[in-house]
């Protein structure tokens, strides 16, 4: 007989660590713009592994069994009680398992049974993952990985999760592990690797790191912050957002080197287009501070260079100014509407 222990039936489970919760709780938004001119070298990132706090908590499953003769248990997780829509099937020799990367704000059902036996009589329990923001993702070998979804918008709609992820690169300064590859393919169901790094970071003979997993690689080079106003990068940002309007590319993963500056700029503009509040746009940028590449703060001179560019556009919010910027660089209204229809 197998008896389920945890999560408790009906429990709500948070995947945020205490450090992540404290970081969010301690943000002050009385002052969205800062006058300090602290610098960040986005092309000379330094790793500090002691500062790695971007990984989420797993959901911990535990059970007991009085059957000592069998080796393998099967943990099955689904979004429906009849298990017609399973999301995980995990073989476990111990009476416990740690599961990462479940969606936030969703009810799940779970059961455990002995391998090669019918699960029909297995006990079924449910739990709900908290609607934590952000939805941090664990990809072994990478850092600063999170879902661009879950945020609320001014329209009252929540940005859909499971479509676009952001994070660090998979090669060079990082090396995604086999377990990380498995998560990208089987947890995130990734279709597209959107690489926004420059040509100097992509060497001759480069083989896309996820090529062997059947994930399409696309390179659209951009530069961050105030560079968004230069003609060459206006063209590149137009290409990037036009690419995002294709629903067939999702789920997709956007990255530069550390998922901080170039990725932070693209994410800021996307969040603005979708209607995120000024406070949430600032918070999303600063959340990179939880990763290994040091703090990202609103008082960085380069970040304020970007805001100064956006200030030249009409509107009372970053959402309005960011949308006006995208229109000005040539992203068509139908393209912007297509992106909104995908994410909202």
Model-based region annotation:
Residues 1-253, 265-344:
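Cys-dependent protein tyrosine phosphatase-like superfamily
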Residues 258, 262-263:
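Ser/Thr-glycine-rich phosphate-binding loops at phosphate-binding pockets of nucleotides
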């Amino acid at each position: 007989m197998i008896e389920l222990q945890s999560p408790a039936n009906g429990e709500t489970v948070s995947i945020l660590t205490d450090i992540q919760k404290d970081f969010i709780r301690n943000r002050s938004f009385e002052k969205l713009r800062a006058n300090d001119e602290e610098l960040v070298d986005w092309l000379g990132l330094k790793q500090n592994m002691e500062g790695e706090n971007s990984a989420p908590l797993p959901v911990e499953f535990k059970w007991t069994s009085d059957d000592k003769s069998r080796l393998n248990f099967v943990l099955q997780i689904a979004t429906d009680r009849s298990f017609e829509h399973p999301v995980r099937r995990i073989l476990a020799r111990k009476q416990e398992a740690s599961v990462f990367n479940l969606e936030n704000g969703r009810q799940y059902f779970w059961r455990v049974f002995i391998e090669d036996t019918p699960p029909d009589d297995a006990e079924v329990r449910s739990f709900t993952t908290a609607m934590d923001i952000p939805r941090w993702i664990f990809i072994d070998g990478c850092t600063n990985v999170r879902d661009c979804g879950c945020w609320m918008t001014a329209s009252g709609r929540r940005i859909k999760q499971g479509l676009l992820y952001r994070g660090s690169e998979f090669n060079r300064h990082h090396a995604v592990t086999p377990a990380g590859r498995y998560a990208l393919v089987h947890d995130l169901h990734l279709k597209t690797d959107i690489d926004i790094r420059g040509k100097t970071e992509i060497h001759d003979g480069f083989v896309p790191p996820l090529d062997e997993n059947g994930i399409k690689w696309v390179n659209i080079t951009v530069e961050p912050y105030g560079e968004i106003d230069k003609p060459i990068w206006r063209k590149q940002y137009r290409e990037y957002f036009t690419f995002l309007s294709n629903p067939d590319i999702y789920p997709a993963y956007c990255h530069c080197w550390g998922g901080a500056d170039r990725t932070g700029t693209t994410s800021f503009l996307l969040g603005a287009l979708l209607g995120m509040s000024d406070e949430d746009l600032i918070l999303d940028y600063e959340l990179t501070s939880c990763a290994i590449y040091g703090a990202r703060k609103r008082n960085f001179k380069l970040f304020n260079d970007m805001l100064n560019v956006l200030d030249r556009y009409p509107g009372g919010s970053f959402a309005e100014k960011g949308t006006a910027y995208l229109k000005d660089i040539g992203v068509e209204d139908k393209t912007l509407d297509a992106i909104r229809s995908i994410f909202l």
